[in-house]
């Protein structure tokens, strides 16, 4: 016997929420793939300074996002099918998956909040080491290539106004093509550009996580209400 009345409304409401959840999973997967292959971050995080690679903490978070997006699409489909079929087993499985996903999202959110400044900090340290080697040692070709990539990608020169002046005077070939001492002094420094690059992307990820968490809470409530409604309708 199918559900009737308010329970039937909840059934279709849950279907709509699950469809939105499935779409959100697709969006997160798409955004994660875009962040993974974004030219700016790819240019910077694929660099190597001697035997030392650029920090990859940012990519760890991106790979987690890719996995989350794929799982969300599967769970969203499971919820849609369970709601339409009025299956307590599928809805119970769906609820369990949601609880696990929600717990993982909370854990990832805490990790992200704790490490939100660490990613940019590690990249800035990597850049500073390369810049120091490039300015001091004329034969440090690897370091020069790393610094040049940072400067061309971010359109900056030096980690501060002082280093911008020093680099422009001593090693102007490390600065972006077509720049001069005056233009370099009025540009944002590379430390600020690195902060802006990663904080903007982390802000986008944070908004997506909050939206998904709200949807998941509603889905958990609706799935349990529908499950109880199906059980009661089968009794009568």
From Swiss-Prot:
Positions in the Cytoplasmic compartment: 1-12, 85-89, 225-236
Post-translational modifications: Not glycosylated.
Compartment(s) of residence: Cell membrane; Basolateral cell membrane
Disulfides per UniProt: 156-190, 157-175
Site (Important for interaction with integrin): residue numbering on this chain: 116, 144, 148
Ranges facing Extracellular side: 34-63, 113-201
Chief location category: membrane
Spans through the membrane: 13-33, 64-84, 90-112, 202-224
Listed GO biological process terms: CD4-positive, alpha-beta T cell costimulation; cellular response to low-density lipoprotein particle stimulus; humoral immune response mediated by circulating immunoglobulin; immunological synapse formation; macrophage fusion; myoblast fusion involved in skeletal muscle regeneration; osteoclast fusion; positive regulation of adaptive immune memory response
Chain sites annotated for binding cholesterol: 219
Stated consequence of mutating residue 186 to A: No effect on integrin binding
Outcome when changing residue 196 to E: Strongly reduced affinity for HCV protein E2
Quaternary context: Homodimer. Part of a complex composed of CD19, CR2/CD21, CD81 and IFITM1/CD225 in the membrane of mature B cells. Interacts (via the second extracellular domain) with CD19; this interaction is initiated early during biosynthesis in the ER and enables trafficking of only properly folded CD19. Part of a complex that includes MHC class II/HLA-DR molecules and IFITM1. Interacts with IFITM1. Interacts with IFITM2 and IFITM3. Part of integrin-tetraspanin complex composed of CD9, CD81, beta-1 and beta-2 integrins in the membrane of monocyte/macrophages. (Microbial infection) Plays a critical role in HCV attachment and/or cell entry by interacting with HCV E1/E2 glycoproteins heterodimer.
Family as reported in the entry's similarity comment: Belongs to the tetraspanin (TM4SF) family.
Involvement in disease: Immunodeficiency, common variable, 6: A primary immunodeficiency characterized by antibody deficiency, hypogammaglobulinemia, recurrent bacterial infections and an inability to mount an antibody response to antigen. The defect results from a failure of B-cell differentiation and impaired secretion of immunoglobulins; the numbers of circulating B-cells is usually in the normal range, but can be low.
Function field: Structural component of specialized membrane microdomains known as tetraspanin-enriched microdomains (TERMs), which act as platforms for receptor clustering and signaling. Essential for trafficking and compartmentalization of CD19 receptor on the surface of activated B cells. Upon initial encounter with microbial pathogens, enables the assembly of CD19-CR2/CD21 and B cell receptor (BCR) complexes at signaling TERMs, lowering the threshold dose of antigen required to trigger B cell clonal expansion and antibody production. (Microbial infection) Acts as a receptor for hepatitis C virus (HCV) in hepatocytes. Association with CLDN1 and the CLDN1-CD81 receptor complex is essential for HCV entry into host cell.
Name of this chain's protein: CD81 antigen
Organism: Homo sapiens (Human)
